[in-house]
Amino acid sequence: MQIIEGKLQLQGNERVAILTSRFNHIITDRLKEGAMDCFKRHGGDEKLLDIVLVPGAYELPLILDKLLESEKYDGVCVLGAIIRGGTPHFDYVSAEATKGIASAMLKYSMPVSFGVLTTDNIEQAIERAGSKAGNKGFEAMSTLIELLSLCQTLKG
């Protein structure tokens, strides 16, 4: 039996984009910082890292599709923060963003990590953006790094 898994180390030549929504920027800025930190700590070259900003989480799938279609990137780390309010808006935005991101990843068969927070309140978002629950941006980039390695291994 063979166990195949990705390594948490970049070669240093991977071109990566961090796609981030600006809405709830107090949270998403911290997620982005965590992702950038992880990229650098695990051998990424800052010159090969692009930050792409969109207005909100609903716009993430369209721009992710454009980034993957361009074939400019080896992978994309997608970040955002959708916080539940008093209307069903949260449900619509989170469902469509999630479906759209997964759809683009499968359409192009490219490594994409999902770091879009969906929380019931601002406190939960803050916890996941660098306090009690760690930084989910850092975790999303870690996932992307492993995916990049695993895809390269499976490619042969």
Swiss-Prot record:
Keywords: Riboflavin biosynthesis, Transferase. SUPFAM superfamilies: Lumazine synthase. It comes from the Bacteria. It is an enzyme of class 2 (transferase). GO terms for molecular function: 6,7-dimethyl-8-ribityllumazine synthase activity. 5-amino-6-(D-ribitylamino)uracil binds at residues 23, 57-59, 81-83, 114. It catalyses: (2S)-2-hydroxy-3-oxobutyl phosphate + 5-amino-6-(D-ribitylamino)uracil = 6,7-dimethyl-8-(1-D-ribityl)lumazine + phosphate + 2 H2O + H(+). The keyword Transferase applies. (2S)-2-hydroxy-3-oxobutyl phosphate binds at residues 86-87, 128. GO terms for cellular component: cytosol; riboflavin synthase complex. The active site is at residue 89. InterPro entries: LS, LS/RS, LS/RS_sf. The keyword Transferase applies. Its EC number is 2.5.1.78. GO terms for biological process: riboflavin biosynthetic process. It holds the Pfam family DMRL_synthase. PANTHER family: 6,7-DIMETHYL-8-RIBITYLLUMAZINE SYNTHASE, 6,7-DIMETHYL-8-RIBITYLLUMAZINE SYNTHASE DMRL SYNTHASE LUMAZINE SYNTHASE. Catalyzes the formation of 6,7-dimethyl-8-ribityllumazine by condensation of 5-amino-6-(D-ribitylamino)uracil with 3,4-dihydroxy-2-butanone 4-phosphate. This is the penultimate step in the biosynthesis of riboflavin. This is 6,7-dimethyl-8-ribityllumazine synthase. The gene is ribH.
